[in-house]
Amino acid sequence: MLSEFLKDYLPIIIFLIIALGLSCAFVVVNLILSPKHPDPEKLSAYECGFEPFEDSRMEFDVRFYLVAILFIIFDLEIAFLFPWAISLGNIGGLGFTSMMIFLFILTVGFIYEWKKGALDWE
């Protein structure tokens, strides 16, 4: 059983080990070869060659993060719906019921967000 598992997944495991090794090697090479004391001019915010008028860190409205998180949640919902819709004929009643429960939970969450005013932009 274990040998069949290794036979099936050995190329993937080797690929992951090589990718992890190369990533670590690139990070180490970057740390070794990069300049340690960068020019202060390069650390300043770039504003068309002028001196920066103000701090480059601006306040960012939290609603943007909320919209991004809601987008990711509903984007993942669609990512789960496509394979489900394709295999709907093969999964039977249990697969249909589990997806309806999943959609119900997401719909309740969406209605809760709507009622709390998280989707209102004021």
Swiss-Prot record:
Q: Which GO terms describe its cellular component?
A: NADH dehydrogenase complex; plasma membrane
Highest taxon of the source? Bacteria
Keyword set for this entry?
Cell inner membrane, Cell membrane, Membrane, NAD, Quinone, Translocase, Transmembrane, Transmembrane helix, Transport, Ubiquinone
Catalytic activity field? a quinone + NADH + 5 H(+)(in) = a quinol + NAD(+) + 4 H(+)(out)
As one GO molecular function, the record gives: NADH:ubiquinone reductase (non-electrogenic) activity
What InterPro entries would the database entry show? NAD(P)H_OxRDtase_bac/plastid, NADH_UbQ/plastoQ_OxRdtase_su3, NDAH_ubi_oxred_su3_sf
- Per UniProt, what is one Pfam family of this protein? Oxidored_q4
Q: Where mainly located?
A: membrane
Read off the Gene3D superfamilies from this record: NADH:ubiquinone/plastoquinone oxidoreductase, chain 3
Its job: NDH-1 shuttles electrons from NADH, via FMN and iron-sulfur (Fe-S) centers, to quinones in the respiratory chain. The immediate electron acceptor for the enzyme in this species is believed to be ubiquinone. Couples the redox reaction to proton translocation (for every two electrons transferred, four hydrogen ions are translocated across the cytoplasmic membrane), and thus conserves the redox energy in a proton gradient.
- Assembly state and interactors? NDH-1 is composed of 14 different subunits. Subunits NuoA, H, J, K, L, M, N constitute the membrane sector of the complex.
The name of this protein is: NADH-quinone oxidoreductase subunit A
Per the UniProt entry, what species is this protein from, by scientific name?
Pelagibacter ubique (strain HTCC1062)
UniProt gene name: nuoA
